[in-house]
Amino acid sequence: MTMGVVLPSKVVSLVIRRPPHFTFKPGDYIFVNIPAIATFEWHPFTISSAPEQSDVISLHIRVVGHWTNKLYEYFESEQVNTN
């Protein structure tokens, strides 16, 4: 399960199912790949959810370049198509 929501200021809130036994501490990051945007590109993002949240991992990603702009456009079109 991956869910993305566009927020003001060109930010995407990305929520990913947390794998079993995945541990992290504040300040840790994960590499993200969205094949619909770029099949072989992985990008690092800081985890914004609390380690105590056991079911999902949250990321807040601001548009700063080509890939993050494509991410924003992808989830923006997903929101338009579901509304």
Residue ranges and their predicted role:
Residues 1-83:
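FNR-like FAD-binding dehydrogenase module
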